[in-house]
Amino acid sequence: GTKAMQEFEPDCIIAVGGGSAMDAGKIMWVMYEHPEVNFMDMAMDFMDIRKRVYTFPHMGDKAYFIAVPTSAGTGSEVTPFAVITDETTGVKYPLADYELMPKMAIIDSDLMTNMPKGLTSASGIDAMTHALEAYASVMATDFTDGLALKALKSIFTYLPRAYNDGANDPVAREKMSIASTEAGMAFANAFLGVCHSMAH
């Protein structure tokens, strides 16, 4: 992907897909704009995203990054995170920096209409976990709490409907797409806890 970008030289990058596709797009964006960057430097452990040993390069000078989710769960379209898996070792590298934040997110629940039940439930529980962990975070604020609680209310109301009725309930699909983004906005600012650490 990065090689194709370097050859084409786009001024706008649109990542369409689930969390993995959007996260891959973020890393391709970094490597396109800053080919000198070392991936392992970006993947260095840290205690606080705001106090880093490694400084991410400034993003957006070459290309505008737009994220378009096709599943309601990861919230990657509104977060400064990307999880990249080394396919040879199976090791997951969580990258975190506000420079990874997409410049725009387009939330269109029509793209999620035909999600299979398994993806609907798994991604819905992911969104619920994001909201719960953001709400319980020691870095939570009144602003993140509002987003997290609203997301949780919507998920508990609409996830069963989206799972059971799928494409026949566009309202549930729309509400879940919004809830996923709200949960993403909450944890982008309040961060996550031990659940996600253990899962990765």
Model-predicted regions and their roles:
Residues 2-3, 7-107:
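Glycine/threonine-rich beta-strand-loop-alpha-helix active-site module
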Residues 12, 36-39, 139-142, 166, ...:
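Secondary-structure transition/capping residues
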Residues 14-18, 72-74, 123, 183-185, ...:
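Short glycine-rich loop/turn motifs that provide flexible caps or phosphate-binding loops at active sites
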Residues 27, 181-185, 200:
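Contiguous, well-ordered alpha-helical segments that form the cores/surfaces of helical PPI scaffolds
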Residues 80-189:
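Carboxylate- and glycine-rich phosphate/diphosphate-binding segment that chelates Mg2+/Mn2+
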Residues 190-200:
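C-terminal catalytic subdomain
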